[in-house]
Structures are given as structure tokens and as C-alpha cells.
Amino acid sequence: YILNFWATWCAPCVAELPTFVKGEKQYKDAKFRFFFVSLDFKKDYSSKVIPFIKKHLPESSVYLLGDSNYNSWINLVNPEWQGAIPATFIVSADPSKCKFFEGEISEKQLFDTLDTLK
């Protein structure tokens, strides 16, 4: 599983989304599942977030995380995570293959990591 935490107001998040969309298509047969978790504010869902998703992630699995108390759950996701976004977690059945990236991930980093897990 590839979990990407992002928001529409985060420029690096928006910049890396095309890489994930490309990866989602390129690694479809490898049975990777991509999930995009938006940390946008609830007040922006209908005016900004939903239109953005329809335009940029129309075929992707996107979740709107409405809990703005990030400090209450960030450590539960990954103790290494300081809370910055974008943040990407690559989860494998083999814990030794799990990866965490805080900050923008390049196409090479993402694809090289996925290639090692195929």
C-alpha cells in the first residue's frame, strides 16, 4: 500500500501528485494500491478540495481526513513522522520493506522503492 498525506494548500504536495498518478497506472499490475489522504480543512471541501480531486485524481482512492487535531494521531501513523506534508508511507506485509518519506518524493525515489517491492 502507498499512503500519501497531502493538502491542496501544500505546493510540494500538489507538485508530486502527478508522480503518484503515473505510478498508480505504471504499477497497476504489480497490485500496489495507492491511497491519497487529504488534510485539507473541512470548510474547503466543497469549494476547493472536491473540484481539485475531480480534476487531478479522478480515478484514485482519496480520503478526506476531517480530524484537524493532527498531534493526536500523527505518532499513531508513524512515530518518525514530525507532521510535515507531503508524507508518504509505503506499507508492506514484510515490515522490513516498509518505507517512510517526509517531504516531496521524486519519481525516481518512488519508482525505485516500488521496484524493490514487486
Located regions from the model:
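Short, internal strand/loop/helix patches
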Residues: I50-I85
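Conserved hydrophobic packing residues within short motifs/helices of P-loop NTPase cores
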Residues: L3, F35-V37, F89
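Thiol-/selenol-based redox modules, centered on thioredoxin-like
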Residues: I85-K118
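Conserved redox-active cysteine motifs that mediate thiol-disulfide chemistry
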Residues: F5-K22
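Short pre-active-site segment immediately N-terminal to redox-active cysteine/selenocysteine motifs
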Residues: Y1, W6-W9, F41, A84
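Thiol-based oxidoreductase modules, predominantly thioredoxin-like and allied folds used
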Residues: K31-S46, P58-S68
